[in-house]
Amino acid sequence: MARVIGDLARPNCPGGPAVIGISEVENERVVRDLVNTSPAKEMNLKYVHYDSPDRRGIDVALIYNPRLFRYTKSSTHPLIIPDNPNFKTRDQLLVEGTMAGEHVCILVNHWPSPYGGAKSSPLREAAAALSKHIADSVRTANPSAKVIIMGDLNDDPKDASVAKVLGATRHKKDTPADGYFNATWGLYDKGIGTLCYQDSWCLYDQQILSANLLGKPANGLSYWKTEVFNREYLVTPDGKKKGYPFRAFNGNIWQNGYSDHFPIITYYVKQLK
């Protein structure tokens, strides 16, 4: 996995990614070992991690390059379901800092599982409502703050949690000034996904941006493009799952892969004065 981090965003960004949101994190030691393994180690990365109440014992975390993202503060936000007080899942992680001289707030997510189909949708809709509340609160407190919502949302861009509750738009032109744009919806429209289930691609891994990231580079930090990172070594080379993400386990068999999800990369640009 350290190899993936070392390769992400290159060659467009020779210094590598500024921030990386990760999920399915067992504990802090896993993140610490990851950033201290070559080639990630040579990037001198830092991280933010908190334990979550999730019953599986998994968390989210943010890895960042302190040369590109100057960390300021962080907080975690639990998902509480009033009608189901015993439900436990991953907290949402808010990390604030400075990137390219601007105030940027990053919300890392891993929304509840899609297992159960429509019956589990209300849980992800509740997670979406929490994400929107956090993002809106940040922007109310500081209207110039640029907000990035990222993570494994366990829903596609068109699903109600993302498109209706969070209100993430399909097209830039349809994004209101106080709204959010789904930078991954265009990929989904092209049939591109980050995970494959029964030969059908899903795009659960998404990045959603506040509208003030949609301006011109001459006026500040701005969105450029999003892509799925699916280098050859991340793809299953043969067998029934050929073309799928090359996961670590195939059933109970260790196959020395990486993940059942491909990462996504979103690029931001700013014109130098």
Identify the residue ranges that each predicted region occupies.
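Alpha-helical scaffolding within the catalytic cores
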Residues: 3-4, 89-93, 192
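Active-site beta-strand/loop signature of hydrolases that rely on acidic residues for catalysis
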Residues: 4-32, 63, 106, 131-163, ...
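Second-shell loop/turn segments in exported
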Residues: 16-22, 49-50, 81-83, 114-124, ...
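Structured beta-strand-rich core segments of catalytic domains in phosphoester-bond hydrolases
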Residues: 19, 25-103, 109-112
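Extracytoplasmic/secreted cell-surface and envelope-processing proteins
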Residues: 29-32, 56-59, 115-118, 156-161, ...
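Metal-dependent phosphoester-hydrolase catalytic domains
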Residues: 87, 137-147, 155-273
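Metal-dependent phosphoester/phosphodiester hydrolase catalytic core
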Residues: 99-129, 133
